[in-house]
Amino acid sequence: MNITQLWIYPIKSCGGVQLSEAKLGERGLEHDRQWMLVDREGNLITQREIPKLVWVRPSISDNELNVSAPDMPDLSLERSATGETKRVRVWGDHMDAFVLPQACEWFEGYTEREVDLVYIPDSSPRPMNPNFGTRHLTFVDGNPLHIISETSVAELNSRLEKPVGLERFRANIIFSDAEPYAEDTWTKISIDDIEFDVYEACQRCVMLN
C-alpha cells in the first residue's frame, strides 16, 4: 500500500486542501474539520442545504485560515479563537465551539443565509463512539480519519455510466497498490510504524453525485 494523496477539509462541507505532509494529532490530521458553519440554533449546515459551499476554498498559512469563493473578497482569520462560545450540534453530538463574528458577514453574504462560522478547540470535549475508542473528535461525522483506495474507486467507476472523482469521497488518506475493496476487510493498518485501527465503513451522502 502506497499513500498517494493527503487531504484535510478545514471547514466542514467546504473545499479541501491537498498536503504533501500532515501532522497527526489526538483528533486526526491537524486542522481537519476544525471549523464549520451552523445556523442560529447551532445546527450544522452542509452542502446538502447550500450546494455552493463546494466553491468555498480554505487554505492554511502561518497562524491564519484563509478563505476564498467566487465573487467574494478573500477572508483571513486567526487559526485559533477565543471569546463567545456557542452550543453546536453535529448529528447527535453536542459540544461547545467558539464563534468567529468577523467571518459572519462574509459567509452570510456568500450563502444569503443567517450563519455562524465556529471553531472547535482541543479543550472542547467530543468523545468518539465508545465502541471504537476513547479519543475525541473535531467536527468530523464519526471517526478521526477517512481512507480510500484508488483501485476501489476505479473499479466502481468501471461500472458507472458517469464516473465519480476520488475527491467526491472527501477522504483524508488516499492510497494505491491494493486490491479493489481490500480496505473493507482490514482491521488495522500501519503507516511509518504508526498503527491505526480500522473501525467501520464510512457512509457517504448525496454529495457524491
Language-model features: locations:
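Metal-cofactor-dependent catalytic cores
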Residues: 1-209
